[in-house]
Amino acid sequence: MNHIFRRSIPITARLPSLGIRSLATATASAHPPVQLYGLDGSYASSLYTAAVKESKLDNVEKALNKLSGVLQQRPEFEQYISSPWLTREDKKILVSSLTQMTGNEPLLKNFYNVLLDNHRLYLLTRIQKQFSTLMRAKRGEIEVKITSATPLDSKILSRLESRIAKSKYGKGKLLVSNKVTPSIIGGLIVEIGDNILDVSVGSRLNNLNKLLSEPI
C-alpha cells in the first residue's frame, strides 16, 4: 500500500517519543492557558506544553511567526507543504527547509516530523494561529479587530480602545488593529476576542457604549 494512505498515527501516541508529552500528563505549570478545539488546537496545545517544559516558548513563538510570514509571502510554498503526494525524499527535504526557516530548533524539527508522519502538515498555518492564541492568553492580551469602510484616525481608535478597556470586555491588555473593508458600508464591526459587535456609524459610538455597558 502506498505510504500516503497509511493509517494516521494518534498524536498522543506519537508525541511522547519526541519529548512532547500529552496534555493529560503535563504538569500544571505547562498546561495551556486556554482550551483549544479541533485538531489544529490539539497540536498547538501539545507544542505549547513541550515548549514550556523545555523553556522554549519565546523561541518557538518567534520561529512560528517567522514561518507564517514566509508562507504569506510565498503561497506556492504553502500549497506544496499541503500536498498529499509528497515522496519520502520530498518529506526529508521539506523538514530540512522548515527547520532552517525556523532557526534550526530541534523541538520544531521533531514537531514537523510528527505532522508529516500523520499527514497533517497542511494544518501548519492554522497551528501557528492557535499557538499565537495561547501566547496572547498567557500574556493576558486581548485582540481587538475593528473593521471599517475607511481607515479610522488615531483619535477614534483611542476612544474605542478607552471605552472597551472600561467595559466587561477589557479585562487584559488590548491589542487594537484597524482593518479596512470597503464592503462594510455605514458600519463598524468590532471583534473583541470571540465577541463580535456590529455598530452603526449613523449612531456613532452610542450603540457601542450601550453594548459595552451591559452587565456581565
Curated annotation (Swiss-Prot):
The keyword Magnesium does not apply. Pfam families: OSCP. Keywords: ATP synthesis, Hydrogen ion transport, Ion transport, Membrane, Mitochondrion, Mitochondrion inner membrane, Transit peptide, Transport. Its main location: mitochondrion. The keyword Glycoprotein does not apply. It is found in: Mitochondrion; Mitochondrion inner membrane. One of its GO terms (biological process) is proton motive force-driven mitochondrial ATP synthesis. GO terms for molecular function: proton-transporting ATP synthase activity, rotational mechanism; structural molecule activity. Gene3D superfamilies: N-terminal domain of the delta subunit of the F1F0-ATP synthase. It comes from the Eukaryota. One of its GO terms (cellular component) is matrix side of mitochondrial inner membrane. Mitochondrial membrane ATP synthase (F(1)F(0) ATP synthase or Complex V) produces ATP from ADP in the presence of a proton gradient across the membrane which is generated by electron transport complexes of the respiratory chain. F-type ATPases consist of two structural domains, F(1) - containing the extramembraneous catalytic core and F(0) - containing the membrane proton channel, linked together by a central stalk and a peripheral stalk. During catalysis, ATP synthesis in the catalytic domain of F(1) is coupled via a rotary mechanism of the central stalk subunits to proton translocation. PANTHER family: ATP SYNTHASE DELTA CHAIN. Belongs to the ATPase delta chain family. F-type ATPases have 2 components, CF(1) - the catalytic core - and CF(0) - the membrane proton channel. CF(1) has five subunits: alpha(3), beta(3), gamma(1), delta(1), epsilon(1). CF(0) has three main subunits: a, b and c. This is ATP synthase subunit 5, mitochondrial. It comes from Schizosaccharomyces pombe (strain 972 / ATCC 24843) (Fission yeast). The gene is atp5.
